């Protein structure tokens, strides 16, 4: 919005010329997201407490979690506001990639909001059924991917980290593959959100990593030099990534151990869906497995646990997702959280190194 309002005035007021610079708008998207979080955060928490939107704690989980009973949830509403408002203020709103990513983030946020509202406000412990949630996720992901492929004419080739000449064209198979990336990322972040600050830290690190990759993808010279896929217009997503980073850090202010508020499904589903969409647009889908390695391991731990119990009658872990396994082994919650952050930082550095290791 500010880009469209103020940049045209640059011919008369040179100061407004800064709005043409993507780096300037990205930095201020981060700052704006932080301000939105800090200004609205206390108010959102009070409203959630007034609604009695309190987290329901599983009795079969770690005993240390029982003290968290009554902590407000649905804090993802604050995250959504901290992403959407800065993006609308600082991004080029004629960019179709920006709108596609916002569509997925808000759409998945609505699915999560509905599920959370039914569980914690209407006191319906089942919330949305797994089929209903999956149907909604697939529908939104399918609409986004079809728009990108058929309207934007996005390439259906796949890029592999470390291999500069390996670009297989999936053709029609790319559509279900891209949908799987978006839906899988959304649910993986959702599964990771089980400890104070455990999910939001890696999400912010992932968003910062994709900020770099969106900037490179949208720059013809840089993408050619680094031999990465060139996606005209993708650079504008750096603004949205900046908003995600700021929203993540801002929410962590309230979600750090011991948490004042939880993000709920409204936050985790939308953030994961946003990361998946960024990966699809930048043609860095496989890279998400690296930088989002913590999310991948969390999701796989659940899949392996369920599969092992169903077919062998035995559990692999004491409890899944795997962060609960470490809790039951006696590792302190803050230590698990910080170690997962450290692992994510290392994985982000490995992901960035793929720009040169080809």
From Swiss-Prot:
Function: Catalyzes the initial step of the lipid cycle reactions in the biosynthesis of the cell wall peptidoglycan: transfers peptidoglycan precursor phospho-MurNAc-pentapeptide from UDP-MurNAc-pentapeptide onto the lipid carrier undecaprenyl phosphate, yielding undecaprenyl-pyrophosphoryl-MurNAc-pentapeptide, known as lipid I.
Top-level EC class as recorded in UniProt: transferase
Pathway: Cell wall biogenesis; peptidoglycan biosynthesis
EC number: 2.7.8.13
Gene designation: mraY
Keyword Cell membrane carried by entry: yes
Keyword line: Cell cycle, Cell division, Cell inner membrane, Cell membrane, Cell shape, Cell wall biogenesis/degradation, Magnesium, Membrane, Metal-binding, Peptidoglycan synthesis, Transferase, Transmembrane, Transmembrane helix
Catalytic activity line of the entry: UDP-N-acetyl-alpha-D-muramoyl-L-alanyl-gamma-D-glutamyl-meso-2,6-diaminopimeloyl-D-alanyl-D-alanine + di-trans,octa-cis-undecaprenyl phosphate = di-trans,octa-cis-undecaprenyl diphospho-N-acetyl-alpha-D-muramoyl-L-alanyl-D-glutamyl-meso-2,6-diaminopimeloyl-D-alanyl-D-alanine + UMP
One cellular-component annotation, GO: plasma membrane
Lineage, highest ranks first: Bacteria, Pseudomonadati, Thermodesulfobacteriota, Desulfuromonadia, Geobacterales
InterPro entries in alphabetical order: Glycosyl_transferase_4, PNAcMuramoyl-5peptid_Trfase, PNAcMuramoyl-5peptid_Trfase_CS
Major place of residence: membrane
Bilayer topology term: Multi-pass membrane protein
Localization in the cell: Cell inner membrane
Pfam families: Glycos_transf_4, MraY_sig1
Tagged with keyword Repeat: no
GO biological process, one term: cell division
Family: Belongs to the glycosyltransferase 4 family. MraY subfamily.
Positions of transmembrane segments: 25-45, 73-93, 97-117, 134-154, 172-192, 197-217, 233-253, 261-281, 286-306, 335-355
Essential cofactor(s): Mg(2+)
Protein known as: Phospho-N-acetylmuramoyl-pentapeptide-transferase
């Amino acid at each position: 919005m500010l880009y469209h309002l103020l940049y045209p005035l640059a011919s008369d007021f040179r100061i407004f010329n800064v709005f043409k610079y993507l780096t300037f708008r990205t930095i201020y998207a981060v700052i704006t997201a932080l301000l939105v979080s800090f200004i609205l955060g206390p108010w959102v928490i009070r409203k959630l407490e007034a609604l009695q939107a309190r987290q329901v704690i599983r009795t079969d989980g770690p005993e240390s979690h029982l003290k968290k009973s009554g902590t407000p949830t649905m804090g993802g509403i604050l995250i959504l506001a901290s992403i959407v408002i800065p993006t609308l203020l600082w991004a080029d709103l004629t960019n179709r990639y920006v709108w596609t990513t916002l569509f997925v983030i808000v759409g998945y946020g609505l699915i999560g909001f509905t599920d959370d509202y039914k569980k914690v406000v209407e006191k319906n412990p089942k919330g949305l059924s797994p089929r209903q949630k999956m149907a909604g996720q697939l529908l939104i992901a399918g609409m986004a991917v079809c728009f990108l492929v058929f309207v934007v004419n996005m390439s259906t080739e796949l890029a592999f980290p470390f291999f500069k000449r390996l670009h297989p064209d999936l053709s029609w198979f790319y559509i279900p593959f891209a949908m799987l990336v978006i839906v899988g990322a959304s649910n993986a972040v959702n599964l990771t959100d089980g400890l104070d600050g455990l999910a939001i830290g890696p999400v912010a690190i992932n968003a910062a990593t994709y900020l770099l990759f969106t900037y490179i993808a949208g720059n013809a010279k840089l993408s050619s030099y680094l031999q990465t896929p060139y996606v005209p217009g993708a650079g504008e997503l750096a603004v949205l990534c900046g908003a995600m980073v700021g929203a993540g850090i801002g929410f962590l202010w309230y979600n750090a151990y011991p948490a004042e508020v939880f993000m709920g499904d409204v936050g985790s589903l939308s953030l994961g869906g946003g990361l998946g969409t960024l990966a699809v647009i930048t043609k860095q889908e496989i890279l998400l497995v690296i930088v989002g390695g913590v999310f991948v391991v969390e999701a796989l731990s659940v899949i392996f646990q369920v599969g092992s119990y169903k077919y062998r009658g035995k559990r692999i872990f004491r409890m899944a997702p795997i962060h609960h396994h470490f809790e039951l082994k006696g590792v302190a919650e803050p230590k698990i959280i910080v170690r997962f952050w450290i692992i994510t930082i290392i994985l982000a550095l490995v992901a960035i190194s793929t720009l040169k290791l080809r």
